[in-house]
Amino acid sequence: MSYSYAEKKRIRKEFGVLPHILDVPYLLSIQTESYKKFLTADAAKGRLHSGLEIVLKQSFPVESKNGQYELHYVDYQIGEPTFDETECQVRGATYDAPLNVKLRLVVYNKDALPNEKIVEDIREEYVYMGDIPLMTTNGTFIINGTERVVVSQLHRSPGVFFSKDDSEEGAFSARIIPYRGSWLDFEFDSKGIIWARIDRKRKFCATVILKALGYTQEQILENFSESKTITSNSKGFALRLDSLSNMKGELLKFDIVDAQDYVIVKKNKKLTSRDVKKIKDAGVDSVAIDFDLVSTLRVAKDIVNEATGEVIAYANDDVTESLLESCVEVGLLELEVIDFITTERGRYISDTLKYDLTRNTDEALVEIYKVLRPGDPPAAASVKALFEGLFFIESRYSLSDIGRMKLNARLGSDKVSKDIYTLENSDIVGVIEELINIRDGKGKVDDIDHLGNRRVRSVGEMVENQFRIGLYRVEKGIRESMSLVHKDKLMPKDIVNSKPITAAIKEFFTSGALSQFMDQDNPLSEVTHKRRISALGPGGLSRDRAGFEVRDVHATHYGRLCPIETPEGPNIGLINSLASYARVNDYGFLEAPYRKVVDGKVTDEIEYLSAIDEDNYVIAQASTKLDENNYFVEDLIQCRSGGEAIFTESSRVQYMDVSAKQMVSAAAALIPFLEHDDANRVLMGANMQRQAVPTLKSEKPLVGTGMEKIVARDSGNCIIARNAGEVAEVDSNRIVIKVDTEKSQTSNLVDIYSLTKFKRSNKNTCINQRPIVNVGDKVEAGDILADGFAADFGELSLGHNLMVAFMPWNGYNFEDSILLSERIVKDDKYTSIHIEEFTCVARDTKLGPEEITADIPNVSESSLAKLDESGIVHIGANVEAGDILVAKITPKAEQQLTPEERLLRAIFNEKASNVADSSLRMPSGTSGTVINVQVFENDKGGKSKRALKIEKELIDKARKDFDEEFAVIESVVKSSIEQEVVGAKIQKAKGLKKGAILTKEFLATLPFSKWLEISFEDEKLEEKVQNAREYYEEAKIAIDAKFEAKKKSITQSNELSPGVLKTVKVFVAIKKRIQPGDKMAGRHGNKGVVSRVLPVEDMPYMEDGTPVDVCLNPLGIPSRMNIGQILEAHLGLASYGLGKKIEKTLEKTRKAAELRKTLEEIYNSVGDKKVNLEALNDEEILTLCDNLKGGVPIATPVFDGAKEEDIKSLLKIGGFATNGQMKLFDGRTGKPFDRHVTVGYMYMLKLDHLVDDKMHARSTGSYSLVTQQPLGGKAQFGGQRFGEMEVWALQAYGAAYTLREMLTVKSDDIAGRSKMYKNIVDGKLTMNVDVPESFNVLRNEVRALGIDMDFDYSSEEE
């Protein structure tokens, strides 16, 4: 096995037993692939039948009302974005690019005849159609400067669905759901009548729809029921038995007798094949039936008197005595009736026709029109147009390819081509027929929660739909413009207004329910947010009406949606996470990968199956035992089939799971020993990992699952080498790689990677990248070059490994509280940097412009000490609560001054009294260091000194960066040319003869520009030098162009909102150490609040004097059933012991041979997966050992982890007792505790629920407008609620004065509180109570009822 650059430095010991079959696919592909499909920007490769291309093709051509103009779509181009991703975030801009569409305007001769079109002119040009937001490389969008994610939606797939309402007997219904257009429902009522609804409006008979389609009553009956012939004779009535075979299995309603009146088959018996043979042998072709049975029948076809043409009876009329007499009179002795006798099929259509009052197509169309447009008078043309527009015109109604595929599959017919996206007559007939079959017990209703009936709508599809909405509005505008604009030379630009497209897309990205502010606490929360699948949002469910079934885990979720990771609370089960190996197919259905089993042998061929396909197969688990030839070991195997868990013979197995972790999501796959935890706790664990705050120093988990490197790699926060090569230069801002051109398919000689430094994330955490390579290191493509935030050597590192003792300590771990050692605070283990952004905006007010200036009235010099001359805080200043960050003054309304005051003002040149101090100050409870300042202003008034200074600094930095970049390229080109040319024969060189040998000394005398002028005799060498020369020239031009573009973007004026003159952003870095009140958690849902930070000397310690870091309550484990944490602690202790063993070996010797022996014992004596230490050279072995001193990292994959014996073996090698318990001593007394304590290393996280963000106190502040009571909550600087129960508590103690104070002056007694303030200022400690405002509110509410109630101020003495 080969190891990457980062893996060589720290090899993780693997415990998985199962073979590695398939790599976890790129975790963000659901986002990136979907949007790529939408944009299909590369026209050269041929655009797909999707995305922008298909929307534009469907919307054009647009024809003017008079037919003179036609606008055709030709092609589109997506331009370059104005700013790059980083600049968009700084400027608060949207990362987008202009969409230019090539349109062709065809002008016809207006004098031509109506039926002929003579082309007069064709005009073509590119038309700007708005800006399309671009996706960043990490699958996000930057909208108005903030990073957002569009969450994929799980919605009901287009097609037809049959369901049953359990509240009513026989209430089956069918619903045809299109991708776009009106819904069509058919439903049974309790009487067996079939009703139809369009868009859930008023119901009407289903046969009305059939008549509107052009079917007559006769045709409807012919389609849905069989007919039989009754003959009338002197004896009575006889039913002709035409097709006996069709009657098999039906219940007979009469006796079948032969010519001798012998009963062959009795009444109320189900007809069998044997009975049919008996009847045929007896030669019976008709059977006598009595009139009672005949009178239940109905006529199958219109009965017409052929002589006169008079209609005796219409189809579906009841067979009555008078009707039979009329038939006999005109000589009709045979009557075709609907067969209700020999078939059990219900008479639903016949009964529905009885309710249906319409007689023909026109009446049916009018009926539908009345339902959809009640109150509108129906006109013949509009009636037909309305109905056709509902289901039969593709621009208004589309099933889409998915809907058509699902509809054809459900009805089991391919009569309709898969390219037809509107409804056909056969579809509607087929749906009603299937509904009747289901009512008759011959079919099944659909499971709506089956993933074969729900599909994923990803970001590309949603933006496509928004674009379609915008384009539809543009289309209407084009038609209007064509008829209104009278111009000689009309061009496409003159008639296209792109604003509706921009508006539709902007609305979706800024305020759409599924376009969300990215969760950016740590890399895992980013990845999880992008892989989220929501059932909420437009066109989805609402959380109030979603029932238990839709939220529940379904059998089809296996390998597609994670059964664990979902939010707690009202959204539980409605928001899910994609399973680690799942993907979305072209139709939008989720697919899971499986290994194909051929003739009992498991192959490595991978096939992806959707939930619909999977129902038909038998699938074995990933952990099923195989022999060395990949055949099943056991005869009976536990499998899944049709949503059930079954035991079956190995010969029946058709597929096998790819991996044990394929059923869980990325977050759940990070939890070691997941299989030993209760599902509820794992859900909390998976969710809490997303809330972990990245700490100052990242530390890998000692006990991991092997998924850490995958999440870190795919999150996009680590820097990954694009090409193989050698590290030429490294500093904190940049990594330069000299590319190995033989290994990499690139013409670049140099790759330069810029690192992100101290950038604010969406959750105010700090994003920072640190290089992990050194100059001279050889790297391969795909190797990690720099760690992002919460990453350690390319592995996700959300917390720290702490030594945990499961024991009580003086009640400080009561109710999940956590007792911490002071060492953790001292070592800055859980110290995190948070970057807050404070914005100050200077606006143009009615009274004049606001001004950012250091000249502020009534402010001391000390308060302005941290500001520069522009009134903006210096970078590097340490700021406390209340400090001014940006000094700003706002004009006040002018006061009427006396002449004396005006004179004094004029003498002292004092103009400050008409301005108010509205400076931006540090909020209460915060302090930190200013790390960055950004100034944005309009160019109208010229730029301020600070803005110019910042601009100059940015330009100088860019120039320096690009110069350094070019210097690196030059040195690489120089060294590569030197290697090739020294010792070569010269063709032509200044100062040397032809054929002379070029020396190093001669080259050293020449400037590099002259090197490039030398030519050589060897043609191959000349070609190589020529390539290097061209690369150098091109690089020089490219870098100059990049600098000019950068300079232009830095100096470009800022587009500020209307009325805004200047915006200043101040970024303050705040360091937060862990303290009591902060929330911590493990990975198994074991959460708690830090109760006390104890001095190291007081913590319990081991026999060798090592104090523990954390004391956890052992009572938190049995009832919660998350035993995984105990196993993690044991394995963590073993890992720590192995690290100590390596450290001791290093102290004795640094010989690689000795170290290899120790490593061999650690890595290869326990577990099935071996590590090839021979692949590492001696230097790499030493580096590895140095990195393993703190503990040997272990991977125990979910459902395939370390066994009890493995843990015991490792504990033994590490020098610990195999039960993982040890004697501890009390740090305060030095005495041992009574019993041995379970001690181990556990990975603990600090969560983003910090006490600093929650602590809050108020003295005075804002009040509610109506009740005049203080507001609530930290955000409003509110007070504490003194509620009903608190009042009872004071009443119980008889604390009348305290109670009066609480309910009046401290709450809503306006006069009382101002008097109180005055008294405090004056030093008086008295309290005057007035009427609370809440009494006035009550009085006014009572007055609204017409009762005049007032307060009696008079005292009792009077």
Curated annotation (Swiss-Prot):
Pfam families: RNA_pol_Rpb2_1, RNA_pol_Rpb2_2, RNA_pol_Rpb2_3, RNA_pol_Rpb2_45, RNA_pol_Rpb2_6, RNA_pol_Rpb2_7. GO terms for cellular component: DNA-directed RNA polymerase complex. Keywords: DNA-directed RNA polymerase, Nucleotidyltransferase, Transcription, Transferase. Belongs to the RNA polymerase beta chain family. InterPro entries: DNA-dir_RNA_pol_bsu_external_1, DNA-dir_RNA_pol_su2, DNA-dir_RNAP_su2_dom, DNA-dir_RNAP_su2_hyb_sf, RNA_pol_bsu_bac, RNA_pol_bsu_CS, RNA_pol_bsu_protrusion, RNA_pol_Rpb2_2. This is DNA-directed RNA polymerase subunit beta. It catalyses: RNA(n) + a ribonucleoside 5'-triphosphate = RNA(n+1) + diphosphate. Its EC number is 2.7.7.6. The RNAP catalytic core consists of 2 alpha, 1 beta, 1 beta' and 1 omega subunit. When a sigma factor is associated with the core the holoenzyme is formed, which can initiate transcription. One of its GO terms (biological process) is DNA-templated transcription. GO terms for molecular function: DNA binding; DNA-directed RNA polymerase activity; ribonucleoside binding. It is an enzyme of class 2 (transferase). Disulfide bonds: none annotated. It comes from the Bacteria. PROSITE patterns: RNA_POL_BETA (PS01166). NCBIfam families: PRK00405.1, rpoB. It comes from Francisella tularensis subsp. mediasiatica (strain FSC147). DNA-dependent RNA polymerase catalyzes the transcription of DNA into RNA using the four ribonucleoside triphosphates as substrates.
